[in-house]
Regions:
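Helical cap/lid subdomain of alpha/beta-hydrolase-fold lipid enzymes
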Residues: 1-180
Length: 180
């Protein structure tokens, strides 16, 4: 692994880490977050007719004068760099993002069925919820203590709606199991 060994010098540790096979593999989250990685991942997956799929999308960028996207001032600080890099993508539709993921990538796999989410969950199809504007990737988990835009009540309401969705999804899948 990448953990420094007890008797290993810091320079030896850096050297070993730099030459790790991890950097040559595509089996990691960093690769999955790239367009090529997401495309590869989507090709390998299919929809299960018995599973409820729902996506939650955020965006926290704004257009610049030259048509790129720039991180909003309230974006989680560590994600402003990646947000700005994504915002310079060659293809315009890939620029709007939440600091880690492009909006277009977070909605649904291109090769699979999708629909706009409603109050009624469905199985076997991606249900795309409306994009949450001025939300960054961290807002979904409430870990940005410096965020002055999201209120505690707003986050709690979001999490309660997720819990309600999970209960509804469980009922939907349980009903099918009972009928089988």
């Amino acid at each position: 692994g990448l953990k420094q060994q007890p008797d290993e010098s810091y320079l030896s540790y850096l050297s070993r880490t730099k030459t790790s096979k991890l950097w040559q593999t595509k089996d990691n989250a960093l690769y999955d977050l790239t367009r090529d990685g997401a495309t590869d991942l989507n090709r390998k997956t299919s929809l299960n007719p018995n599973i409820v799929y729902k996506t939650y999308t955020a965006e926290a960028t704004h257009p610049t004068l030259i048509g790129k996207q720039k991180a909003d001032y309230n974006m989680f600080l560590p994600f402003t760099v990646t947000g700005n890099v994504i915002g310079k993508a060659t293809e315009k539709e890939w620029r709007e993002n939440d600091g880690l993921v492009s909006v277009i990538s977070s909605q649904h796999p291109f090769n699979q069925k999708y629909t706009q989410a409603t109050d009624q969950n469905q199985k076997g199809i991606w249900q795309v919820t409306p994009t949450k504007h001025d939300w960054d990737h961290v807002d979904f988990v409430g870990q940005d203590s410096s965020d002055t835009v999201r209120t505690r009540e707003e986050l709690q309401q979001f999490w309660h709606s997720l819990a309600d969705d999970l209960v509804q999804s469980e009922k939907l899948t349980s009903e099918q199991k009972a009928q089988a």
